[in-house]
């Protein structure tokens, strides 16, 4: 699968996770609604589904994993930043085939697209601190 298809999968996953966080609907319903309403022709659907299900089922663990690296409590994070950080923490902790620099850079790009003005700086700071601990020194 092309890297662009994975990037699109991450973009779609962040949007769907944002919707899930706000609506508190079942993740399967959010996925179904998202896929039926959005243009997903250039998306790695398998990866999108893995990210969505992985983050949704492990959100609490991912929050605990990132908490030591945050400058504020998780419930004080914006919903967009929370979705992006959860996705990146999932990739860092569960997808060792994704180089940690790729996971961080993709999260920064997502924050530039979807986040508030300087959220990409916040995301970068959190992930730069978290990556060595989460990956235990693996590059």
Curated annotation (Swiss-Prot):
An MF annotation (GO) of this entry: RNA binding
Pfam families membership: NusB
GO cellular component, one term: cytosol
Annotated signal sequence range: none
Transferase recorded as keyword: no
Record keywords: RNA-binding, Transcription, Transcription antitermination, Transcription regulation
GO BP annotation list: DNA-templated transcription termination; transcription antitermination
SUPFAM superfamilies: NusB-like
Functional note: Involved in transcription antitermination. Required for transcription of ribosomal RNA (rRNA) genes. Binds specifically to the boxA antiterminator sequence of the ribosomal RNA (rrn) operons.
Family affiliation: Belongs to the NusB family.
Name of the protein described by the UniProt record: Transcription antitermination protein NusB
